[in-house]
């Protein structure tokens, strides 16, 4: 999610110089920007919202409507990052129907309306490309959403993934136009209404500015409206998940993967299972429960329209980015190896030392660092790919990981989209080498993975990108929550331990569903 930097230094102008309640840019400045042939211009207004919360603002602005989202980030140790992003409205959603590009809503003129939906993502960002306005937050508009694991077949020669039990579009990217950006450093809330040049002409400039201002006014009115109390207690409702694979079936997958590794077909293979539970709760309440219990670097709630006229929700707390592009720099953070957090500081330190001393964990992590370097070398300038942080311990609320940081500078002609394609999917979700590992996974699992192992995040109008790996995530659709988790299999893996690892990885999201089902507003009585 935007800006994992916890620095509280004031942002540069024009953001920091905005007077409270003032609309920027003025019509005069807006006209100057429009005549520079910008396809998108953010019109903004800064208000004080130190008594509000991101969840409360999302509730007021989104009103459970499709095309809305909430993005947040908690750093190591649970410290919340500077910005929280509320998506209040999307002009349209770029998705896929029967394998082809499909728009829900009215996209601007000149955007692709047929063909490969992943290429449509690339071409939409290119068509709406607009230089960043200095001083505004890192995300003020763009394509926000999810790309499933199964989209990899559009970029790699991988066999068909078997049955599709979720009916999930491979691409679902919302064209986010109206946002509210929390700046936790000063308690301000920046309301953003993007004026999109829908017809690619210089006409109707004043009308476009007036429309954006009216949308700011509407958001301000919605924020000012009284809201019912959401103070609650939680009495979790136990759920017994069903799985895509029985325990013996999963352990047979592990043995098959080990046999393939011994035969030299792969170094590592990530096999997974999908857990499903009823989900009577609202997705926002699932997010609230997950936010409290498992804060992570990538927290997200997205309500996405489906081509069939319904909507589905994605609720997650992913610890891991696939790729982030800022300016011309691409950054990835391979994560492999884990231990639970200790019961005391000394115990925690002991577990960290044990993790770093585990030869199997170190070997797996080194393999993934090499894979990340190879991926970046496909799209970065020679000599710029570097491992700037190697095998550091990163601590989260319930778990610690070994994490490294690999960076590189994009070559001329390469975009953030190209960086996404080069690194997709994460080696931590496939294994290595990727193409053969993915082919084996398809044979073992027998199902399309859907969201699991894909990405959730954004490509903005200025050409930047931030994509989290879709793990520790619940897909809520048709009254059920689906949570998938995997284990990286190597030659000496123990089947029953790998099964238990998947159960443990799925636990946080499943607990959040149970907690949300048992959320009771103060004063309510269970029926």
Label every model-predicted segment:
Residues 2-527:
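Extended alpha-helical targeting/anchoring segments
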């Amino acid at each position: 999610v935007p800006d994992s930097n916890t620095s509280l230094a004031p942002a540069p102008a024009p953001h920091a110089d905005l007077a409270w309640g003032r609309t920027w840019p003025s019509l005069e400045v807006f006209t100057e920007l429009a005549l520079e042939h910008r396809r998108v211009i953010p019109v903004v207004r800064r208000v004080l919202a130190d008594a509000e919360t991101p969840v409360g603002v999302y509730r007021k602005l989104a009103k459970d409507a499709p095309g809305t989202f909430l993005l947040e980030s908690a750093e190591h140790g649970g410290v919340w990052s500077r910005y929280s992003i509320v998506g209040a409205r999307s002009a349209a959603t770029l998705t896929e129907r029967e394998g082809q590009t499909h728009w829900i809503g009215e996209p601007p003129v000149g955007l692709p309306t047929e063909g490969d939906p992943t290429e449509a993502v690339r071409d939409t960002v290119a068509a709406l490309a607009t230089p960043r306005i200095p001083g505004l937050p890192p995300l003020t508009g763009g394509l926000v959403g999810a790309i499933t694991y199964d989209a990899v077949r559009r970029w790699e020669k991988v066999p068909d993934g078997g049955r599709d039990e979720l009916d999930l579009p491979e691409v679902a990217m919302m064209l986010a136009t109206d946002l509210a950006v929390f700046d936790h450093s000063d308690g301000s809330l920046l309301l953003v209404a993007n004026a999109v040049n829908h017809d690619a002409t210089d006409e109707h400039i004043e009308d476009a500015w007036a429309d954006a201002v009216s949308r700011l006014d509407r958001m301000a009115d919605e924020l000012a409206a009284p809201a019912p109390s959401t103070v609650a207690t939680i009495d979790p409702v136990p759920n017994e998940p069903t799985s895509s694979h029985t325990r013996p079936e999963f352990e047979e997958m592990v043995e098959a993967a080990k046999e393939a590794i011994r035969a030299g077909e792969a170094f590592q293979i990530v096999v997974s299972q999908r857990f499903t539970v009823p989900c009577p709760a609202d997705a926002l309440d699932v997010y609230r429960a997950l936010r409290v219990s498992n804060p992570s670097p990538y927290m997200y709630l997205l309500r996405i329209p489906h081509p069939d006229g319904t909507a589905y929700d994605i609720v997650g707390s992913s610890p891991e980015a696939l790729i982030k592009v800022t300016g011309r720099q691409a950054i990835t953070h391979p994560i492999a190896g884990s231990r639970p957090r200790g019961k005391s500081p000394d115990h925690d330190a002991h577990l960290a030392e044990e993790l770093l001393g585990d030869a199997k964990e170190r070997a797996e992590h080194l393999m993934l660092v090499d894979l990340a370097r190879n991926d970046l070398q496909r799209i970065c300038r020679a000599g710029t790919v570097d491992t700037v942080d190697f095998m550091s311990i990163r601590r989260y609320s319930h778990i610690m990981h070994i994490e490294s940081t690999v960076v590189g500078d994009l070559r001329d002609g390469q975009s953030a989209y190209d960086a996404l394609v080069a690194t997709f999917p994460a080696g931590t979700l496939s294994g290595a080498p990727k193409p053969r590992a993915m082919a084996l996974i398809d044979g073992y699992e027998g199902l399309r993975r859907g969201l699991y192992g894909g990405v959730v995040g954004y490509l903005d109008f200025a050409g930047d990108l931030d994509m989290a790996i879709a793990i520790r995530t619940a897909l809520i659709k048709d009254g059920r929550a689906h949570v998938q988790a995997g284990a990286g299999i190597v030659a000496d893996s123990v089947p029953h331990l790998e099964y238990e690892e998947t159960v443990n990885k799925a636990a946080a999201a499943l607990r959040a569903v149970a907690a949300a089902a048992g959320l009771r507003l103060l004063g309510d009585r269970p029926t």
